[in-house]
């Protein structure tokens, strides 16, 4: 598997469209001005930052144990490498999304789709699909005539309605933990509402904070409670009202993990499952089949869930309100989410996020 990964990265980095980042052959070459590569200064800054990071006591201790760590606690697991190399040559990445997927049968999204089809064909009608991603979207694509050709949320909800014993659990960032205000606006104003709210309630939620999020007639209504407590869809966002940015003592770092697992296997890789990962980036990851790795991911998932709120619940709404009222740098972007999302959509920038 290591050899296969090496070949993948070699093909990627040697692609003619990439800029070369040559290493220094000797320490004094930079000062002599031999290299005119503008990336060198960034590489130096990166090395200095890495040096500082490794000097932290906890990191230093873990680095000292790295040799042992790399040789212990491995699991016997079936593994398959998957990639998005097809994105290197795709020209019409949004309008030809289906054709592009079918032309790259080893792509991450193609294989996920086939695995789900196979599970359905084999009569698997119960279980839970777990997804962790910092910037999770659910793709919606149109052809050149503007006709909808695929809606990820719609497809998933249809599958769930046909399989009432299947659940979907998602963990992603919140306005408190996200480092990308634009993608978080898409998550809170589009992705989660498409899974949980009716079109009418989506319109109210998106209209304004006063008419939706801060309106007791909406968030305390029986309809709202019924919608957000979907028996099969659970969307959690990391963070809590005890955070240091709200005057508490808890530290919530940004979520950056990306993995999926189901009843017997899953996927771990670089893809965020947002538009940028799906359409433009050259993502890499491994599908696995084995209980050992799966159990470790279960433990990570449950740990993350214990420090998260379910989307739409009173606790989640309270966290958002307190973030908006705080004096942190998160406050402004949280208050402006609706305007941010509407601007992104009006300018057609969703697919670049």
What residue ranges belong to the model's regions?
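Surface-exposed polar/charged interaction patches
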Residues: 14-17, 69-72, 104, 118, ...
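A Trp-anchored, charged/polar loop motif used as the substrate-binding/catalytic surface
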Residues: 98-120, 148-154
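PLD/PLD-like phosphodiesterase catalytic module centered on the HKD motif
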Residues: 1-44, 123-130, 134-353
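Active-site cores of enzymes that catalyze phosphoryl transfer or operate on phosphate-rich substrates
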Residues: 27, 38-111
């Amino acid at each position: 598997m290591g050899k296969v990964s090496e070949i993948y990265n070699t093909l990627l980095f040697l692609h003619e469209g990439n800029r070369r980042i040559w290493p220094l052959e000797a320490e004094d070459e930079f000062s002599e001005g031999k290299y005119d590569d503008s990336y060198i200064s960034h590489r130096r800054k990166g090395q200095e930052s890495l040096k500082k990071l490794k000097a932290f006591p906890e990191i230093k201790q873990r680095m000292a144990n790295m040799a042992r760590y790399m040789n212990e606690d491995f699991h016997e697991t079936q593994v398959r490498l998957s990639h998005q190399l097809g994105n290197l040559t795709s020209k019409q990445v949004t309008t030809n999304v289906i054709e592009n997927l079918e032309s790259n049968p080893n792509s991450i999204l193609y294989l996920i789709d086939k695995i789900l089809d196979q599970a359905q064909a084999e009569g698997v009608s119960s279980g839970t699909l777990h997804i962790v991603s910092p910037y999770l979207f659910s793709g919606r694509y149109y052809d050149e005539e503007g006709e909808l050709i695929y809606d990820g949320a719609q497809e998933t909800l249809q599958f769930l309605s046909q399989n009432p014993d299947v659940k979907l659990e998602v963990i992603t960032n919140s306005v408190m933990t996200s480092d990308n205000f634009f993608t978080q606006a898409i998550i809170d104003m589009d992705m989660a509402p498409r899974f949980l709210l009716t079109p009418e309630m989506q319109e109210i939620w998106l209209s304004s904070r006063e008419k939706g999020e801060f309106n007791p007639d909406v968030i305390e209504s029986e309809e709202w409670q019924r919608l957000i407590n979907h028996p099969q869809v659970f969307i959690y966002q990391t963070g809590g009202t005890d955070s240091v940015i709200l005057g508490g003592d808890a530290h919530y770092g940004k979520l950056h993990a990306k993995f999926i697992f189901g009843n017997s296997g899953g996927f771990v890789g670089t893809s965020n499952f947002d538009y940028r990962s799906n359409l433009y980036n050259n993502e890499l990851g491994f599908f696995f089949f084995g209980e050992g790795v799966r159990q470790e991911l279960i433990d990570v998932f449950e740990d993350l869930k214990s420090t998260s709120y379910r989307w739409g619940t009173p606790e989640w709404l309270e966290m958002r309100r307190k973030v908006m009222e705080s004096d942190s740098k998160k406050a402004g972007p949280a208050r402006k989410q609706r305007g941010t999302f509407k601007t992104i959509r009006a300018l057609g920038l969703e697919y670049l996020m």
